[in-house]
A protein has these predicted regions:
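Asp-based, Mg2+/Mn2+-dependent phosphohydrolase catalytic module
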Residues: 1-23, 28-50, 59-80, 90-300
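Conserved glycine-rich Rossmann-like NAD(P)H-binding loop of the short-chain dehydrogenase/reductase
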Residues: 53
Length: 300
């Protein structure tokens, strides 16, 4: 069924208790708000008693670091309302009672390290392996830590061959070693005219060398939907997922049984939404989240 354009913001707002917002392409793009109406939109929803949750597949920062970004942009958001895929990796390991005497090898940035250590896990890799190299000489044998019980892979601007090989050895040679991906996002945007390789490209490299599918903890996996619903005591049918990507945000909402609202302020254009090649259709779409302010104008 084709998506309908948002015409009655009031009806949508009244139909749910909670709004889950993606961040990049919805709240901000880079280091700027999507538009000046974002703060007022969030304030309006709060004034109507709606719970707000912010969920990003970007694993480069911790929840605390994202809290700082929200404040820098002039938005009042509690850290308990923020959920990143770096946090999701730690939450997943806690949910399966990952042994604290085992270690986690991280291919990713400090956001993952921070969240894992905050949860009490021992970490290797991450930024400390950014400059490491391997000399591929005949007979070379690479040592790796046999106590690594999980490899967590996220977006990594300092991705290199050393990390690929170390992670591969852990997954292939350490019995029961888990392969966890924060997301499989293919691309992201910085300037609106170019697409940049996302964390899925790093995950793909490890998948290619290990021939093992990862456990994905970010969108569109339902792990964080289940986690958030349990944490706040929410029925998923009372949630509206708001995002700019069809194959992560909207699919995440659909997989979780939520209402879905696509905004055209990020990766997905109207042409992409309407394309006959697109098989993911949100319940509603609109240009940006400040279109929800139409309810305010209508009641003045």
């Amino acid at each position: 069924m084709a998506a309908a354009k948002l015409e009655d913001a009031d009806a949508l707002i009244d139909s749910v208790e909670t709004f889950i917002f993606d961040c990049d392409g919805v709240i901000w793009k880079g280091d700027k708000l999507i538009d000046d109406g974002v703060p007022e939109t969030l304030d309006l929803l709060r004034s109507k008693g709606k719970r707000l949750v912010f969920l990003t597949n970007n694993s480069t920062r911790s929840r605390k670091q994202y809290g700082s970004k929200f404040r820098t942009l002039g938005l009042t958001v509690d850290e308990e309302e923020i959920f990143s895929s770096s946090f999701a990796a730690a939450a997943y390991l806690q949910s399966i009672h990952f042994p604290k005497d085992k270690k986690v090898y991280v291919i990713g940035e400090e956001g993952i390290i921070n969240e894992l250590e905050l949860a009490g896990f021992q970490c290797l890799g991450g930024p400390s392996d950014a400059d490491k190299k391997i000399e591929l000489t005949p007979g070379f044998y690479m040592e790796h830590d046999k106590d690594v019980g999980a490899v967590v892979v996220g977006f990594d601007r300092y991705f290199n061959y050393y990390k690929v090989q170390y992670g591969t050895l852990c997954i292939r040679e350490n019995p029961g070693c888990l392969f966890i991906a924060t997301s499989r996002d293919t691309v992201f945007q910085l300037n609106g005219v170019q697409e940049w390789a996302g964390g899925g490209s790093m995950v793909g490299a490890i998948l290619g060398s290990t021939k093992q599918e990862p456990v994905v903890v970010g969108k569109p996996s339902t792990f964080m939907m289940d986690y958030i619903a349990k944490k706040f005591g929410i029925t998923t049918s009372q949630i509206c997922m708001v995002g700019d990507m069809l194959d992560t945000d909207i699919l995440f909402g659909q997989n979780g049984g939520c209402k879905t609202l696509l905004v055209l302020s990020g990766v997905t254009s109207h042409e992409m939404l309407q394309s006959h090649n697109n098989s993911i259709h949100p319940d509603l779409y609109t240009n940006q989240i400040s279109d929800l302010l139409a309810v305010k104008a209508a009641t003045v």
